[in-house]
A protein has these predicted regions:
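Beta-strand-turn-beta hairpins that frame and shape the catalytic cleft
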Residues: 1, 80-85, 97-113
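N-terminal, active-site-proximal structural segment of metallo-dependent hydrolase catalytic domains
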Residues: 1-56, 68-70
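Active-site metal-binding loops of divalent metal-dependent hydrolases
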Residues: 3-5, 37, 114-116, 145-147
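Surface-exposed cleft-lining segments at the edges of enzyme active sites
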Residues: 7-9, 88-92, 113-120
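Active site of divalent-metal-dependent phosphoester/diester hydrolases
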Residues: 13, 45-46, 59-78, 97, ...
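Alpha-helical elements of Rossmann-like donor-binding domains used by nucleotide-donor carbohydrate transfer enzymes
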Residues: 18-23, 52, 103, 128-133, ...
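Short, Asp-centered acidic motifs that coordinate Mg2+ and/or phosphate
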Residues: 30-31, 140-142, 185
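His/acidic metal-ligating clusters that form di-metal
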Residues: 105-112, 124-147, 154-157
């Protein structure tokens, strides 16, 4: 599952992590890649959002900071039913703000999460970095994320040269209240 939580702000402009946890608990995924997550930031009430969501869902949390924001950290996270053997995150380019790629390693597979830049050149550079980082993996890989790219973009086509699209290619995901763009996907390796 991929979920851009928008620092906990719902469509009613109210911050409510319990609602986000309710969505996750209703679906009961084994893994959730979270984007736009605050960690102890003033703007989100000094709450460690990924830890609170882990508490509310009973899942294991991992956070990958992208940048400092509002006297805290901002980035992406993952929630998993199983504790990973290890994890790593690497910085990705972002013209408007730094971005991150997070991978959780398990004995038989690797689960990754990302949030790509709004800038097409930064997205292409991110794809190259991800491909270079993951080329030595010898087990199945799943990448969730807010990729900020539509299916007809050259970045999407570049991603599909190395990765297989696993999510519904017709599912419009943005904006939440009246989705008309496809920006969020789940990819797997071609092996």
């Amino acid at each position: 599952m991929s979920y851009n939580i928008r620092i906990g702000i719902g469509m009613d402009q109210q911050t409510n992590l319990k609602r986000i946890a309710e969505v996750i608990n209703k679906i009961q995924p084994d893994y959730v890649g979270l984007q736009e997550v605050d960690s102890v930031c003033e703007r989100s009430g000094w709450i460690n959002q990924y830890a609170e969501l882990a508490r509310l869902t009973g899942m294991y949390p991992i956070f990958a900071p992208a940048t400092e924001r509002s006297k805290g950290l901002y980035g992406i996270a993952a929630l998993s039913r199983k504790k990973p053997r290890s994890y790593q995150y690497i910085p990705l380019p972002g013209k408007e703000e730094p971005r991150t790629f997070l991978c959780l390693e398990y004995p038989n597979y690797t689960l990754c999460n990302t949030h790509f830049s709004l800038d097409p050149d930064s997205r292409l550079a991110s794809i190259r970095l991800i491909n270079e980082t993951m080329k030595s993996e010898n087990k199945p890989i799943l990448i969730t994320g807010d990729f900020n790219m539509e299916p007809d973009s050259k970045e999407f086509k570049a991603m599909k040269q190395t990765w297989r699209l696993l999510s519904d290619p017709t599912l419009e995901t943005y904006p939440s209240d009246h989705p008309r763009l496809r920006l969020d996907y789940i990819f797997g390796d071609l092996a």
